[in-house]
Structures are given as C-alpha cells and as structure tokens.
C-alpha cells in the first residue's frame, strides 16, 4: 500500500471528521484523481518536442501520456483543429498516491527558493491546481537528457464540497502551503 494512502486512512480521516463534524465516514473528502498536463504551443512547428515531452511525462508518472489535440482553429496562432498541442496523464488509485508522495516530499523540496505552495489556487469546488515551471525538480528526469525546460500543471481533483475542505484535506496529507 502507498505510504500516503496509509496516512490518509489512518490519520487524515479522523482529523477531518473531528474538524468538520462529519457523521458518516463517506462524507470525508478524498482525492479522486490527479491530472498532469503539459501544454506545448511550440509543438505546432516541431512535433519532436511533443514526443520528448510525452516520454518525460511518462518517466515522471510511470504511465504513458496521452497526446492532446486542439479543439478549435485559431488563425493568429497558426493552429488548426485536431493538431497535437500537448500531452496529459490522469492518475488514480495507487499510482496517484505514489505520485503525490513524491511531489510533496521530494520534488517540491528541490524547487529553488521554495517557501511553500499558494493556498489560493483552489477552483471553488475543492480542487487544487499547481503550476510547476520546470520538469527538472523530479528525480526521474536527467538534466543531460532534456532538450528544453518545460513546465507542467498538476490538478488534484478531490471530492470536497468547497475550498476550505479541500485545503484541510491537502494540508493534513502534507502539502506544504505558504503561511
């Protein structure tokens, strides 16, 4: 069992039940999925960038990345509908907990001048989105093998009803929020 899942089941559930006075254990918010997205606008000119990004995302998550395509044509960006412009991975269950554990305890600690993540990046329904400026903070990525520094977005989807519950869930699980 993943370490973070064990922490959630044995510690976080009790803390949240006491904090929000939940009567039923199924009311306690939980993390449903983690979506990691890498948007690459420069993939319009060079498709090889997309292949390297997908392989790096696969190394980071342990799961094959899906290529995302443009939904609309935008003439000013020289973009046509259906052109590949990014890649994403959706993690659930064990892999999700393993990734979050590595993100919170290893990767975020490797960010330069890290003071904690913003507590304002919630969407109103208890979901949290975190932007990462470079993929080098993950230990799976070798500095010598990358051709370009790319950023990525990590969205943590929870079953929380509001931002307050979502923030409490992530805080108890070990997300390093700024004070």
Swiss-Prot record:
The keyword Nucleus does not apply. The keyword Cytoplasm does not apply. One of its GO terms (biological process) is translation. InterPro entries: Ribosomal_uL5, Ribosomal_uL5_bac-type, Ribosomal_uL5_C, Ribosomal_uL5_CS, Ribosomal_uL5_dom_sf, Ribosomal_uL5_N. This is one of the proteins that bind and probably mediate the attachment of the 5S RNA into the large ribosomal subunit, where it forms part of the central protuberance. In the 70S ribosome it contacts protein S13 of the 30S subunit (bridge B1b), connecting the 2 subunits; this bridge is implicated in subunit movement. Contacts the P site tRNA; the 5S rRNA and some of its associated proteins might help stabilize positioning of ribosome-bound tRNAs. Belongs to the universal ribosomal protein uL5 family. This is Large ribosomal subunit protein uL5.
